[in-house]
């Protein structure tokens, strides 16, 4: 039996590591969840994700409720109060229980002398909640985005920025990809129905199913046997444009964790696929996915800017470049992105994308297809990136996705309930 731990203090420390140390929640959270019971894992995740989703609001409230900020060794208390406020605002946890557990969290972080302070701040919020929220809702902070990102969204999408920001703050649906080599989508949906769950097919992507209610993967029919994979609908859209064929040599560049590698092999089981990623640690995820689905691909560690180091002079029939990006299209899945990214990251990422595009293009056969994809909504990484590439690359031609003036296809988060995603299909003349 696992030792009873204070979830509020664990969540506070996790959020502090994200905000103060720039660590990714996807690295921090899983080890913490191993320390708690199964029933507490979901609550711990909800507290971490929820606080990061609403961080700017919680920060603003604390500044209103406290005369001076908590600093130094007491900084964790700041995040513990955030966890308390989040529970009072956004969860069904009874207020008395939320207060009691949050106050007890002070003992777990070795600040028992501050229990009274934490209790006082949270009770003051309860008294002033209506007044404070009315004031907060007149400010830009109500969109729950850092100001630099809000400005970029407003500039890029004068008519849509509010709906994009709102979509980023929602809980994402759970999308699945049905392995067409095992089942048709309809036959798998029948199995799902027999298991007491309901799913809905995507109108455009033939393998995509949205669960009515998110479920643990072990509850999905045939998950361990490779019948189904968790993958957002927009990510599945890459195959629409790549259209892999049996017998072709196909490169999946920046491939980890391998979702698109395995999708290529589901669509074209006899393709020769090379999956490359710069992060050696993440290559294990590609191997895990290939093993679960019973597939084979050549997996290599390599930098997309220097392809000759890992493929020599080899050329490919098709290349999928899922470029490193700001991930501003998947904020609803990874709310820490809002606080890990900085405005200065965008031109740096655009430069990296440009270098990879230029380096990999010679490795595409004449007549071949390259699909450039990102999970970003920012034009600098997407349409402007491809427009510049087309202008400097004489043998590159845009195909089916947009126009030379406005190249590519941009999915916005929430549109068709998929993530924010960009695709551009390029043909080598």
Curated annotation (Swiss-Prot):
Enzyme Commission (EC) number: 2.1.1.176
UniProt-annotated location(s): Cytoplasm
Coiled coil ranges: none
Broadest EC class assigned to this enzyme: transferase
Residue positions binding S-adenosyl-L-methionine: 254-260, 277, 303, 322
Transmembrane regions listed in the UniProt entry: none
Cellular component terms (Gene Ontology): cytosol
Active-site positions on this chain: 375 (nucleophile)
Gene3D superfamilies linked to this entry: Helix hairpin bin (1.10.287.730), NusB-like (1.10.940.10), Sun protein, domain 3 (3.30.70.1170), Vaccinia Virus protein VP39 (3.40.50.150)
Example GO biological process: rRNA base methylation
Cysteines engaged in disulfide bonds, as pairs: none
HAMAP family associated with the record: 16SrRNA_methyltr_B
Family: Belongs to the class I-like SAM-binding methyltransferase superfamily. RsmB/NOP family.
PANTHER family for this protein: NOL1_NOP2_SUN FAMILY PROTEIN _ ANTITERMINATION NUSB DOMAIN-CONTAINING PROTEIN (PTHR22807:SF61), NOP2 YEAST -RELATED NOL1/NOP2/FMU SUN DOMAIN-CONTAINING (PTHR22807)
Task of the protein: Specifically methylates the cytosine at position 967 (m5C967) of 16S rRNA.
The protein's name in its UniProt record: Ribosomal RNA small subunit methyltransferase B
